[in-house]
Amino acid sequence: MQETGVHNGAHGADKFGLKNLKGIYWNFGAPQLYEHALRNGEAVLSADGALVADTGVFTGRSPKDKFTVRDATTETTMWWGGNQSITAEQFETLYQDFIKHAEGMTLFAQDLYGGADPSFQIKTRVFTELAWHSLFIRTLLRRPDRADLAAFVPELTLIDLPSFRADPKRHGCRSENVVAIDFARKIVLIGGTQYAGEMKKSVFTTLNYYLPERGVLPMHCSANVGPAGDTAIFFGLSGTGKTTLSADPNRTLIGDDEHGWGKDGVFNFEGGCYAKCIKLSPEAEPEIFAASSRFGAVLENVVLDEITRKPDFDNGSKTENTRSAYPLESIPNASPTGRAGQPKNVVMLAADAFGVMPPIAKLTPAQAMYHFLSGYTAKVAGTERGVTEPTPEFSTCFGSPFLPRDPSVYGNMLRDLIHNHNVDCWLVNTGWTGGKYGTGHRMPIKVTRALLTAALDGSLRNAEFRTDPYFGFAVPTALPGVPSDILEPAKTWADKAEFDKTARALVGMFQKNFAKFEAQVDADVRAAAPDVKIAAE
């Protein structure tokens, strides 16, 4: 077997059972991986120097094809209400079949860190069949110094083989596509899909399992910090604006998707960003556009002009879930450390497809826990397979597919952190105004940015607030530069009776969804629920 590149020879591929390989390329950088991806026909070049790849049938995550080994430990530590299980024996069969399938292949290996805080990071080794997948995960996780690679000993191992086809009867899975995690052995197997996001979310899921035991809250969020050292966290599902809103030229970016919050503050899990880029423009999102238009960026399912090879970011013919992966250092004001102090503000983003939520609301600590456990948003087109238009969704902790443990574990940790550090909490609707999806329109990003700026710089604290009659939270009545009507959703609807009917319906959905958490939360959190009786007055 031919091996090229720097790595720890005492902890090579053979330690994981990989054998009879044609070769391994260890820890290659972007130029080398570009060469291999282009030579192998995996990807093409854009006119701006980005590597552009198609992911085939799978243009989003497949949460129904994700499985975790159920053993004596995970029997009691896993949240089986939200996760699917396979037996240790089924995983071992799958693992051996992966090893057999890899024989004769040339693989790409990356040694990386999951987590910017050395006290809590997990050393991760990723074997990939495709060169562009190797570049993707090298971009998304954190890269060790070259001098540290020779002594790198992995704790978590991912094997990513898109050409592998699982057998549901043999492997205990659902289809030919599979993501399987064994927390005891710290091994992740990904087969049958070229969608690169499965790799990063598998590392995220692993950190979500281990970090609560060590007093760190893992979060599906973005984070940035202001000139005064004021850290802000933005919770939200894919497509709600985490990446866009955290890329603020007046604030330092910590990260766009995954973070931990512990006794020393906030730290990024990653070293790159993974931005939705449908309708990406230099006017609306200049920093993300620039980062996606240069050497080192990886574009997924983005259509190129046949002649100019310029990306057509407005073209969603392959999927609405077009993506751009780029290193954090491509953002001019990104933090080199990926770490920041204790948050001053927590923002919960919701793409309200009903168009009845205000653009911003201030939450009490009890309301914050209620809305964190509810995780209301809309499934935005293309983020998961089979979703072609936004539909209402409650995803607990704003990341249900990535939660190995019971949601109450994360909710209680958030409650304590908010209380201990006197954090201000906000709910922001980045979804629809002037009507529900189909009749209204998306909330203008300029409005959202103006409201967020006022919240984060403290000026919104001094505003006059009204109590929303449906949801009970505090909504500002006026803010310079923001149309007053947009702050009161009912005024943006032509049909006020239809607004009332729609708002009441959403209140009922919140109550129905939260019923499963009522026995696990304190009375003040139950009292923070939207109230149909209020809405009916």
From Swiss-Prot:
<feature type="binding site">
    <location>
        <position position="323"/>
    </location>
    <ligand>
        <name>substrate</name>
    </ligand>
</feature>
<comment type="function">
    <text>Involved in the gluconeogenesis. Catalyzes the conversion of oxaloacetate (OAA) to phosphoenolpyruvate (PEP) through direct phosphoryl transfer between the nucleoside triphosphate and OAA.</text>
</comment>
<dbReference type="GO" id="GO:0005829">
    <property type="term" value="C:cytosol"/>
</dbReference>
<dbReference type="Pfam" id="PF01293">
    <property type="entry name" value="PEPCK_ATP"/>
</dbReference>
<feature type="binding site">
    <location>
        <position position="323"/>
    </location>
    <ligand>
        <name>ATP</name>
    </ligand>
</feature>
<keyword id="KW-0479">Metal-binding</keyword>
<dbReference type="GO" id="GO:0006094">
    <property type="term" value="P:gluconeogenesis"/>
</dbReference>
<feature type="binding site">
    <location>
        <position position="285"/>
    </location>
    <ligand>
        <name>ATP</name>
    </ligand>
</feature>
<comment type="similarity">
    <text>Belongs to the phosphoenolpyruvate carboxykinase (ATP) family.</text>
</comment>
<feature type="binding site">
    <location>
        <begin position="236"/>
        <end position="244"/>
    </location>
    <ligand>
        <name>ATP</name>
    </ligand>
</feature>
<keyword id="KW-0547">Nucleotide-binding</keyword>
<keyword id="KW-0312">Gluconeogenesis</keyword>
<feature type="binding site">
    <location>
        <position position="448"/>
    </location>
    <ligand>
        <name>ATP</name>
    </ligand>
</feature>
<keyword id="KW-0210">Decarboxylase</keyword>
<feature type="binding site">
    <location>
        <position position="257"/>
    </location>
    <ligand>
        <name>Mn(2+)</name>
    </ligand>
</feature>
<keyword id="KW-0963">Cytoplasm</keyword>
<dbReference type="GO" id="GO:0005524">
    <property type="term" value="F:ATP binding"/>
</dbReference>
<comment type="pathway">
    <text>Carbohydrate biosynthesis; gluconeogenesis.</text>
</comment>
<keyword id="KW-0067">ATP-binding</keyword>
<feature type="binding site">
    <location>
        <position position="220"/>
    </location>
    <ligand>
        <name>Mn(2+)</name>
    </ligand>
</feature>
<protein>
    <recommendedName>
        <fullName>Phosphoenolpyruvate carboxykinase (ATP)</fullName>
        <ecNumber>4.1.1.49</ecNumber>
    </recommendedName>
</protein>
<feature type="region of interest" description="Disordered">
    <location>
        <begin position="311"/>
        <end position="342"/>
    </location>
</feature>
<dbReference type="GO" id="GO:0004612">
    <property type="term" value="F:phosphoenolpyruvate carboxykinase (ATP) activity"/>
</dbReference>
<dbReference type="InterPro" id="IPR008210">
    <property type="entry name" value="PEP_carboxykinase_N"/>
</dbReference>
<dbReference type="InterPro" id="IPR013035">
    <property type="entry name" value="PEP_carboxykinase_C"/>
</dbReference>
<keyword id="KW-0464">Manganese</keyword>
<dbReference type="InterPro" id="IPR015994">
    <property type="entry name" value="PEPCK_ATP_CS"/>
</dbReference>
<feature type="binding site">
    <location>
        <position position="201"/>
    </location>
    <ligand>
        <name>ATP</name>
    </ligand>
</feature>
<feature type="binding site">
    <location>
        <position position="195"/>
    </location>
    <ligand>
        <name>substrate</name>
    </ligand>
</feature>
<keyword id="KW-0456">Lyase</keyword>
<feature type="binding site">
    <location>
        <position position="220"/>
    </location>
    <ligand>
        <name>ATP</name>
    </ligand>
</feature>
<feature type="binding site">
    <location>
        <position position="201"/>
    </location>
    <ligand>
        <name>substrate</name>
    </ligand>
</feature>
<dbReference type="GO" id="GO:0046872">
    <property type="term" value="F:metal ion binding"/>
</dbReference>
<feature type="binding site">
    <location>
        <position position="201"/>
    </location>
    <ligand>
        <name>Mn(2+)</name>
    </ligand>
</feature>
<feature type="compositionally biased region" description="Basic and acidic residues">
    <location>
        <begin position="311"/>
        <end position="321"/>
    </location>
</feature>
<feature type="binding site">
    <location>
        <position position="61"/>
    </location>
    <ligand>
        <name>substrate</name>
    </ligand>
</feature>
<dbReference type="InterPro" id="IPR001272">
    <property type="entry name" value="PEP_carboxykinase_ATP"/>
</dbReference>
